[in-house]
Regions:
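Alpha-helical segment of the N-proximal tetratricopeptide repeat
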Residues: 1-36, 40-47, 74-91, 119-126
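TPR/Sel1-like alpha-solenoid repeat signature
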Residues: 11, 23, 38-45, 57, ...
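Canonical positions in the second alpha-helix
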Residues: 26-27, 60-61, 99-100, 139-140, ...
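Structural marker of alpha-solenoid helical repeat scaffolds
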Residues: 30, 64, 103-107, 143, ...
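Active-site scaffold of zinc-dependent metalloenzymes
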Residues: 272-319, 329-343
Length: 343
């Protein structure tokens, strides 16, 4: 049995995930509750992109070995890092992180505690809970002070919280130890862009793109008139029940969100937001309140162009963003919009 497990491990390490899966399933035919084989099976399914099957496989593994730190970490990583924009999956992964963190503390396993704290910080950043993410990431760095992964993720949290000077210092610190870290260059480009340093922003973006072109494709750029036309088409395509709310609502396009827009809420809005609704939702307005500002919707062209990978995707996202902000105008919150697929 040990030799067969070693063969599965060798296949997995060599990147032959089909062979690793076949070997793990062969082991499970003889020993259905062998934790190591269950773990290899689930992990191989992840690497093969069969995520739904992987989720079930991790469930089986955790049923057999509910306190196995390695299985818990792999299952949490699958949910946090591989599930894309699935907030429910990320939330489930965060629950596994909390469980693993407690078990690692109990076992005095510093390395695994660090891993769970780092993954927790990543998941919290994805959920937009960046202040809480900072707590986890600072704790992770308390155990592994030189961790570049934790430093980068901490810089991202600071950026999302609009603490731009601190984020800049964090990413510059990363580059001292890892001059070719693409995410540090990318975020330093975003920070330079916000302060109007176009030359520095371009240099940073070009560097990040050269390092990992698949992560940072060139933005899909539209001329001003073409972008405005796409916005007009998006408004025309709105359902009739939504259009009725747009009387006396200004729809505008700006390059990037201002500090005023971002810091007008607590916690602040993400600097990467695609659009924003300014004003009071229709259901909350009062004819007695003379101080209510006129309602407006703003789309942020550079963020939208960076978000999309093709012209078609950009046009589609403009439509989704317009509908999203009209949803806020109608009084829907982020959870309502997420349930409607408009997040």
């Amino acid at each position: 049995m040990e030799a067969r497990l070693d063969a599965v491990a060798d296949a997995f390490e060599a990147g032959d995930f089909e062979a690793a899966l076949a070997g793990a399933e062969g082991l499970l035919a003889d020993a259905p509750e062998l934790p190591e084989a269950l773990h290899f099976r689930a992990s191989a399914l992840v690497e093969l992109g069969r995520l739904e099957e992987a989720g079930k496989a991790f469930g089986q593994a955790l049923k057999v070995a509910p306190e196995d730190l390695e299985i818990l970490l792999s299952a949490a990583d699958c949910l946090v890092c591989r599930a894309g924009e699935d907030r429910e999956a990320v939330a489930e992964g965060l629950a596994l992180c909390a469980r693993g963190r407690r078990l690692a503390q109990k076992a005095d396993d510093v390395e695994m505690l660090y891993e769970f704290l780092l993954l927790e910080g990543m998941g919290l950043n994805q959920m937009g809970e960046c202040a809480t993410a900072l707590v986890s990431l600072d704790a992770a760095l308390g155990h592994m002070p030189r961790s570049l992964d934790a430093q980068v993720e901490r810089g991202i949290a600071l950026f999302e919280l609009c603490r731009f000077d601190e984020a800049k210092a964090a990413f510059e610190k990363v580059l001292k130890d890892a001059p070719d870290d693409p995410w540090a260059h990318h975020y330093l480009g975003l920070i330079a862009e916000r302060r109007g340093d176009e030359k520095e922003a371009k240099r940073r973006f070009d560097k990040a793109r050269a390092l990992v072109p698949e992560e940072f494709p060139p933005p899909v750029e539209l001329a001003e008139a073409e972008f405005d036309r796409a916005v007009e088409d998006a408004v025309k395509s709105l359902p009739r029940h939504a259009k009725q709310y747009l009387d006396n609502v200004t729809i505008a396009v700006e390059d990037l969100p201002s500090d005023e827009d971002l810091l007008g809420q607590d916690p602040p809005l993400s600097p990467s937001i695609l659009g924003v609704f300014r004003g009071t939702p229709v259901g909350e307005r009062s004819v007695m309140n003379a101080y209510e500002l006129p309602a407006s919707i703003v789309l942020y062209q550079r963020n939208l162009e960076r978000f999309a990978r093709t012209r078609e995707e950009l046009i589609e996202q403009i439509g989704i963003t317009v509908m999203h902000e009209v949803g806020h105008l109608m009084g829907l919150d982020e959870d309502d919009l997420w349930q409607r697929g408009l997040d």
